[in-house]
């Protein structure tokens, strides 16, 4: 019986990985002109109190951007800067989302949550509101963090994540990320979906692999939140991955 259970579980994990791949975005050819407007765009950052979000805010300010952070609890964002505006709101509330999007040039999303053990649409419904507000306000570009393990990157977080973490701990979370990606791809905005490996709190190396096919089928791949933020902000000034979903890892 234990062998039967083990075989059944492995088949479930593989089936889930295949399903995430089929339901997610396919691999696509990246744009090649590599150019974007030279002017420093004004940024709205959502998910700004999370690990990647804090890095996005700090690094964007260091690069000279004007930054608006939409957060549920402003006291959790312990950054003060003359070019930082903090708005209290929730991505589930369209009115607060539209107010935050108004006047921006780019929206950068590092949305996340810790409600792993039940069905949820926090990511997808929040993203739906962001895209709706962007289209209403004429904001062109959207940079969004999701994860390796979805779409064409299914299975590329390594065996441990493919066979255990995703199917046992994070299946609902990854299904919602898959819905999130499909909403973005169906929108009219200029988008880049960034799929990182397993996130760490190490410092920024500034050197990492990025491509729609990065990752490993065997070994767990990692990258720091600081490097993910660096790569996401680089997409403000480049069209290389426009309307594609590159992975990023060390």
Regions found by a protein language model. Give the residues of each.
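Non-catalytic terminal and boundary segments that flank Rossmann-like NAD(P)-dependent oxidoreductase
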Residues: 1-41
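N-terminal Rossmann NAD(P)H-binding glycine-rich loop of SDR-like oxidoreductase domains
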Residues: 43-63
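NAD(P)H-binding glycine-rich loop region in Rossmannoid oxidoreductase-like domains
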Residues: 43-44, 75-129, 133-136, 236-240
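Conserved catalytic-site region of short-chain dehydrogenase/reductase
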Residues: 116, 148-154, 199-202
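Conserved Rossmann-fold NAD(P)-dependent oxidoreductase catalytic core, especially the SDR/UDP-sugar
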Residues: 44, 66-68, 74, 128-172, ...
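Substrate-positioning beta->alpha
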Residues: 123-126, 176, 194, 223-233, ...
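Conserved beta-loop-beta element that borders a ligand/cofactor-binding pocket
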Residues: 181-202
């Amino acid at each position: 019986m234990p062998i039967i259970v083990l075989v059944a579980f492995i088949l479930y994990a593989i089936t889930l990985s295949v399903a995430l791949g089929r339901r997610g975005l396919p691999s696509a050819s990246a744009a090649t002109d590599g150019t974007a407007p030279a002017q420093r765009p004004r940024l709205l950052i959502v998910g700004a109190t999370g690990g990647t979000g804090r890095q996005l805010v700090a690094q964007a300010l260091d690069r000279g951007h004007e930054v608006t952070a939409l957060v549920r609890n402003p006291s959790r964002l312990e950054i003060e800067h003359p070019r930082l505006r903090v708005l209290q709101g929730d991505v589930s509330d369209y009115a607060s989302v539209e107010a935050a999007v108004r006047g921006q040039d780019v929206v950068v999303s590092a949305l996340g949550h810790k409600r792993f053990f039940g069905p949820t649409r926090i990511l997808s419904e929040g993203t739906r509101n962001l895209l709706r507000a962007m289209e209403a306000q004429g904001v062109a570009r959207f940079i969004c963090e999701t994860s390796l393990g979805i779409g064409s990157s299914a299975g590329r977080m390594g065996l441990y994540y493919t066979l255990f973490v995703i199917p046992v701990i994070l299946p609902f979370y990854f299904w919602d990320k898959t819905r999130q990606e499909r909403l973005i791809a169906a929108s009219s905005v200029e988008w880049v979906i960034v799929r990182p490996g397993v996130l760490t709190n190490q410092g920024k190396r500034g050197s990492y692999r990025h491509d729609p096919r990065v990752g490993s089928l065997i070994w767990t791949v990692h990258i720091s939140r600081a490097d993910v933020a660096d790569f996401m902000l680089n997409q403000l000034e480049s069209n290389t991955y426009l309307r594609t979903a590159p992975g990023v890892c060390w």
